Amino acid sequence: MRYVINHDLHIHTKLSSCSQHPQQTPENILRYALDNGFKTVCVTDHYWDETVPGASGWYAPQNTAHIRQSLPLPQVEGVRFLFGCETDLDRHCTLGVSPARFDELDFVIIPTTHLHMTDLTVRGDETAEERAALWVKRLDAVLSMDLPFHKVGIAHPACGLIAPSRKMYLQTLRLLPEEEMERLFTKAASLGCGIELNASDFGFPEEETEIVLRPFIVAKRCGCQFYCGSDSHEPDEFTGVMQRFARAVDLLGLTEDDKFLLR
């Protein structure tokens, strides 16, 4: 059976510093879920646990008290509205969420491809070769942690933020070693974490299809399961999301067996 698009597990509210849109509220996110027939949605604002050293000046205000301002989330019959976060991984591969905090979150999204945060995640002057090596190193670091992987999502593996230009971005994806991707995604599949189908990752032109899909094709071949994430920061970004998700499902030939289920 074809993969059914019935969820969105990566949504920001106005509490995320990169959003701050007054209409990006839990109530409007719930309306978006109802309008699209979703059974599960999850709020995932940017978060750095204040008990973990190393937060950048941008991340530091986005602490526990800050993201918990969304609670309690509005609930209606037929829709699971969950409370999660999108954290980060610094240059030393320190995760921005402490082990104890996982119990307070329904879902934790970990982006290993935020290679645009100078000083926090990168120096800023890395070559494509170095960025490809970081892609491998950072995912490897996360998969080597002692985490409750049944509620962990690996965000946007083909994120445009991997490099400062489209040319370098595509070059970086080409440089990802096939054998390393196979090793990492085989491990991810065995651990049971989800791999994100981020709507923004699937807006590429046709001529880029082969290169952008590389990580996803390997992940599928290795038995990984996938979840949909709009990564929306404001209401207008909900427009076209279903078409992007459908494109991902069709290009990868996903079925219900390929779906990550957040229990």
Task: Please identify what each model-predicted range represents.
Residues 79, 151-153, 257-259:
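Residue-level recognition of the N-termini of beta-strands and the immediately preceding loop/turn
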Residues 35, 102, 148-151, 251:
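Alpha-helix termination/capping residues and helix-transition junctions
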Residues 2-137, 237:
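A metal-dependent hydrolase metal-coordination microenvironment
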Residues 34, 143-147, 220:
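Non-catalytic positions within long, well-ordered alpha-helices that form the structural scaffold/packing
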